């Protein structure tokens, strides 16, 4: 969790996401739990931490050869962009029933591989009660997702409008997506450039 090592990032998140929820109630975050953000009210208690929206995939065996073909300056620029405040989001960070967190599940799921656009597709499906590779995980965290009331509420709260169509009915994928059966990472240099 990047913010566990960066008080600055944690403070930015606290500032950005301490605001009214879609139902008009305040969602005030504090730092009463070390290295985490925290909210406690009649809405429930949530311990939250950040997760990256974009990744270079430079440490993934299947993309190593592709990344070798990317100009070093271009890759550094992408890393820098991924490291801005817009490159992170918060999720609940406490395990429920000793199961994976959202952050962990989206990272290890071979159909998602930490791609945020695919995670957002899973979130969209969750709100309209369609199955997805992360549905079981999201069900454990339904109290968190209930805060936002709908997919549009979630997107608007976290300022993710650039990643969805104007009517919120579909995702603007980083690379083409048809089904979760397809390999989720870029297959060649052209797809990688499109992804970044």
Task: Enumerate the language-model features and the residues they cover.
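Intrinsically disordered, low-complexity acidic Ser/Thr-rich regulatory segments
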Residues: 42-84, 145-152, 158, 164-168, ...
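Residues immediately within or flanking Cys/His clusters that coordinate Zn2+
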Residues: 86-89
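C-terminal, well-folded lobe of enzymatic/effector domains
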Residues: 100-196
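Context-gated lysine
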Residues: 14, 19-20, 28, 40, ...
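Hydrophobic, well-ordered secondary-structure elements that form the walls
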Residues: 92
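Intrinsically disordered, low-complexity N-proximal targeting/linker segments that flank membranes
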Residues: 1-70
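Short, glycine-/Ser/Thr-/acidic-enriched flexible segments
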Residues: 95-98
């Amino acid at each position: 969790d990047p913010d566990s090592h960066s008080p600055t990032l944690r403070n930015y998140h606290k500032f950005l996401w301490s605001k009214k929820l879609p139902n008009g109630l305040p969602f005030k975050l504090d730092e009463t739990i070390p290295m985490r953000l925290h909210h406690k009210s009649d809405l429930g208690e949530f311990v939250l931490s950040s997760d990256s929206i974009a990744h270079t995939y430079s440490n993934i065996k299947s993309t190593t050869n592709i990344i070798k073909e990317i100009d070093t300056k271009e890759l550094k620029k992408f890393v820098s962009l991924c490291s801005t405040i817009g490159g992170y989001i918060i999720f609940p960070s406490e395990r429920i029933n000793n199961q994976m967190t959202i952050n962990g599940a989206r990272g290890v799921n071979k159909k998602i591989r930490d791609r945020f656009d695919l995670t957002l597709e899973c979130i969209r499906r969750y709100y309209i009660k369609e199955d997805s590779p992360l549905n079981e995980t999201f069900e454990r965290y339904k109290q968190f997702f209930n805060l936002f009331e709908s997919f549009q509420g979630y997107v608007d709260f976290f300022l993710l409008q650039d990643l969805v169509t104007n009517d919120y009915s579909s995702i603007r994928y980083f690379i083409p997506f048809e089904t979760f059966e397809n390999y989720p990472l870029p297959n060649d240099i052209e797809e990688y450039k499109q992804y970044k």
